[in-house]
């Protein structure tokens, strides 16, 4: 049933999921999380990791710690033999998150180092904006919050996509993209590369302020001028793509050809 004034937001899975999903057999509770996992040891490990990740990412993105959430975030953990993925669900009302939950699937090591930081970043953004975030900013920021291996893979992929006629999105279109396009991989790759460029330029808090302004008045040229000193979205795009090419040329050939780890 739909409730007027409330929105539920479900970011798409980061990757396709594989394997058999075991039943959830144990629970661990912390100040901000309730973790359901196949064993008490796994539940405790990921619950503690989630609290630490929440603190670190809030400091990185917001320059401050978050207050305790009114309701704990449910994390469902499913250990799988192959593949990995994550999904975050939020309900919003009057600019606030009213409920949140996370599903994690993959090996324990991958969940701790890759998937959990990605999903916690979505939650940090949900608190900051109080509404569904534009896809490029949400997914790009979440990937930036993850491991360096993912970042290198997406950077290489973005270069391939931008050099494939008809596959990449112009930056002006990407900035206003609210729904996942048919080519989700291209969205993820371009979004990561762009967010990394902006974060490296002025930092994470400035990036969030930039996105907030752009979302409020839809004047991305004005937001670009105010926060990054470029005259237009197109000038930013040229600088971003030029740096992306320079990064690829400076990357050792062995790393360029590496494949993404599941």
Spans of features found by a protein language model:
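A detector of low-complexity, intrinsically disordered, Ser/Thr/Gly/Pro/Ala-rich segments
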Residues: 5-6, 18, 257
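Sec-dependent signal peptide recognition
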Residues: 8-16
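Hydrophobic h-region of N-terminal signal peptides that target proteins for export
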Residues: 16-25
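Acidic/His/Gly-enriched intrinsically disordered linker/tail segments
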Residues: 80, 89-99, 107, 111, ...
């Amino acid at each position: 049933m739909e409730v007027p004034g409330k929105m539920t937001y479900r970011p798409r899975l980061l990757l396709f999921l594989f394997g058999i999903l075991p039943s959830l057999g144990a629970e661990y509770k912390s100040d901000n999380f309730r973790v359901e996992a196949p064993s008490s040891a796994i539940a405790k490990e990921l619950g503690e990791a989630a609290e630490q990740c929440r603190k670190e990412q809030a400091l990185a993105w917001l320059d401050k710690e978050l207050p305790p959430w009114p309701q704990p975030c449910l994390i469902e953990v499913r250990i799988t033999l192959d593949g990995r993925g994550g999904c975050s669900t939020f309900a919003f009302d009057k600019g606030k998150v009213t409920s949140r939950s996370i599903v994690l699937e993959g090996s324990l090591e991958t969940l701790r180092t890759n998937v959990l930081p990605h999903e916690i970043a979505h939650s940090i953004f949900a608190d900051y904006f109080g509404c569904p975030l534009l896809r490029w900013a949400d997914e790009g920021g979440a990937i930036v919050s993850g491991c360096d291996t993912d970042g290198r893979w997406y950077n290489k992929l973005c270069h391939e996509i931008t050099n494939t006629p008809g596959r990449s999105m112009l930056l002006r279109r990407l900035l206003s993209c609210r729904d996942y396009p048919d080519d989700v991989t291209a969205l993820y790759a371009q979004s990561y590369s762009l967010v990394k460029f902006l974060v490296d330029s002025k930092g994470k808090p400035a990036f969030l302020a930039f996105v907030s302004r752009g979302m409020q008045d839809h004047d991305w040229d004005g937001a670009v001028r105010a926060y990054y000193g470029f005259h237009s979205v197109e000038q930013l795009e040229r600088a971003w793509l030029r740096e992306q090419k320079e990064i690829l040329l400076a990357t050792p050939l062995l790393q360029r050809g590496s494949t993404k780890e599941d």
